[in-house]
């Protein structure tokens, strides 16, 4: 079995799990987010947990993480760098849960909202990067380039803070291991199913920090078939 997955293989894993193994996408997202939340709890952040959610399923993972950490009694704040009306599928379903729970969240967040949230963070807080997923290639566009730069600057100035990346540090090409202009420098990366190719190539190790492979319920037979090809 291969030790790593490429971008295309990662996409294929999800597609086969849903279409051939009849695993609903919302179940995979729930497993991913719940297990990330459990890992975050094990890291025992003493301050606030600030979750940065982007568009698409990476943001949806962030919503699941926010819900489970909030339910566990942790101090959670959510910044959503997207218009919630643009969410669809599993991400939309989980955003509806967030709004029904009235969890502290700022939608249509801006770089100014991030600056204020970072300024208000207590020491030893944890920042969850659920901005951009494995599909990123080319150059990171506005406003995410500015957001990533601000998070990295905060990390440099606050050595007791933890930056926790969901699946892949935002802006890191998961095939080449090179930043797409800019990329989150994570202390911890929780990646789904298997390590990504870019974690062990290029500059990947400089951006991922400590890596953890998260089980999202993919049948071993699927992985055996895919990685044998």
Swiss-Prot record:
Pfam families xref list: YjeF_N (PF03853)
Binding site for K(+): 58, 129, 170
Cofactor, free-text remark: Binds 1 potassium ion per subunit.
Gene3D superfamilies listed in its UniProt record: YjeF N-terminal domain
Reaction(s) catalysed (UniProt annotation): (6R)-NADHX = (6S)-NADHX; (6R)-NADPHX = (6S)-NADPHX
Keywords: Isomerase, Metal-binding, NAD, NADP, Nucleotide-binding, Potassium
Positions contributing to (6S)-NADPHX binding: 57-61, 133-139, 167
Xref: InterPro entries: YjeF_N_dom, YjeF_N_dom_sf, YJEFN_prot_NAXE-like
HAMAP family: NADHX_epimerase
Entry protein name: NAD(P)H-hydrate epimerase
Native organism taxonomy: Bacteria, Pseudomonadati, Planctomycetota, Planctomycetia, Planctomycetales
Gene: nnrE
């Amino acid at each position: 079995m291969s030790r790593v997955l490429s971008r295309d293989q990662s996409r294929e894993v999800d597609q086969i799990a849903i279409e051939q193994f009849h695993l609903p996408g919302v179940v995979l997202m729930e497993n991913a987010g719940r297990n990330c939340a459990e890992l975050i709890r094990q890291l025992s952040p003493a301050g606030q947990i600030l979750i940065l959610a982007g568009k698409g399923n990476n943001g949806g993972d962030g919503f699941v993480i926010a819900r489970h950490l909030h339910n566990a009694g942790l101090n959670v704040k959510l910044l959503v760098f997207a218009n919630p009306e643009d969410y669809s599928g599993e991400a939309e379903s989980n955003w509806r849960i967030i709004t029904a729970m009235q969890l502290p969240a700022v939608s249509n967040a801006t770089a100014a909202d991030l600056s204020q949230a970072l300024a208000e963070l207590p020491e030893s807080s944890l920042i969850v990067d659920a901005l951009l997923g494995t599909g990123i290639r080319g150059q990171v566009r506005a406003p995410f380039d500015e957001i990533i730069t601000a998070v990295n600057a905060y990390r440099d100035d606050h050595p007791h803070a933890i930056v926790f990346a969901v699946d892949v540090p935002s802006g890191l090409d998961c095939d080449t291991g090179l930043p797409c202009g800019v990329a989150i420098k994570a202390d911890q990366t929780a990646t789904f199913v298997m390590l990504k190719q870019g974690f062990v190539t290029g500059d990947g190790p400089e951006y991922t920090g400590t890596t953890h492979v998260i089980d999202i319920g993919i049948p071993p037979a699927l992985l055996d078939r895919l990685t044998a090809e």
